[in-house]
Amino acid sequence: FVLDKGPLIVLDTAIVKGNAKISETYLFNYLSLKPGSAFNESQYKKISLKLKELPFVAEARPFEIEYMPGLARPVFYLQNKKASQFNGVVGVQPDNANAGKVYVTGDVKLRLHNAFGRAELFDLNWNNPLPRTQDLKVKMSYPFILGLPFGIDFDLTLFKKDTIFLEINRQLGFRYLLAGNNSIRVFAGKKTN
């Protein structure tokens, strides 16, 4: 009995067809594919499931593999999904404590996900319901820095009431990115009152 393993086939670059704005580096890292490595068909069985987990792209049709002598090239058919949002109301009201003055009031929510094609996230929530009161929450996240399985994120929370109370929370985190959307996070934070 003789086992013929056949020729070595290595993974080549990917082709993304469709209107999806996504970096090939991010896509390969997210799907745990490494260009230049030996092609392993079992890696491709879960790709469609992994792509469904992404909030900003959808498969227009199942991916295909193009074979060339010694190379395998995945072809993805991806469409953008709306993952970013903006919601807000801003107004001006008279300030009863200071005659003739006004203050800005409002509630604004802005979420930008994958705006630059690298799966980055920017999230801002601002709320100013009363005079001299501010509530601000900002989150930023950037995965796969320099194509490595590491990401960085930053959180800022600010709450101000009048001139007597100010609370600021800051947090800087580093993530080791695992398969799918899972990660291990290490962070440092500072809280001031």
Predicted regions, residues:
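N-terminal periplasmic "start-of-domain" segments of outer-membrane beta-barrel proteins
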Residues: 21-35
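Gram-negative/organellar outer-membrane beta-barrel architecture
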Residues: 21, 37-193
